[in-house]
Amino acid sequence: LIEVKNFGRAIDPAKDIAAFFEVKKMAAEIKPDVIHLHSSKAGVIGRVAFNGEIPMFYTPHGYSFLMENYKPMKRRMFKLIESVCAKRNCMTISCSVGEHQESLKLTKHATYVNNGINMAELQEIIDKTEKVEHPFTVYTLGRICYQKNPTLFNEIAESLPDVKFVWIGDGELRDQLTSENIEITGWADRSTAIRYAVNAD
């Protein structure tokens, strides 16, 4: 794992340009056979940096221009950027049917691969997990962000004070989970997350 020191989620022109040259330098040293870009920010930087030089795949994990928490002008700007980058020499791989449909509006070089679950591994972890006595427990798993609607999760928890709520994960909106019956586990590896889930209802 190699950190791109100048890479961040927020748009920062100075850091984004620095990240562009940083990944170019890394690629020159590593000489990868294939590059797989994840999320919009990496997708833009990577597709601009390596167009045609190295075979590339791009997985959006949710297009920024579809996020309703952004103002319309910002969403239009994000869509324009995606439209320009979609013309680069890259295959877009979507993880859902809806995302794939959006990808096809931008480029014909798109395919869809559903999220997969290793059922044998999952069952093995479940079988090894001790079931413990617990109050009625509701859980969710993922990053605490706008798309996951932590405000609604908090409202439901407040309306059911006798029920335990567990959020497996962490994120920038964790401060919105204020109800006393909510436990935030923080980021957990797969085995730990499954063990939390097994002891929920």
Residues covered by each model-derived region:
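Donor nucleotide-sugar binding/catalytic pocket of nucleotide-sugar-dependent glycosyltransferases
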Residues: 2-3, 83-126, 137
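A short, histidine- and acid-enriched strand-loop-helix "catalytic/donor-clamping" loop
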Residues: 7-11, 54-74, 88-91
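Short His-centered aromatic/hydrophobic patch
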Residues: 37-43, 60
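Conserved donor-binding/catalytic core segment of Leloir-type glycosyltransferases
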Residues: 131-148, 154-158, 165-166
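Acidic donor-binding loop of glycosyltransferase active sites
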Residues: 198-201
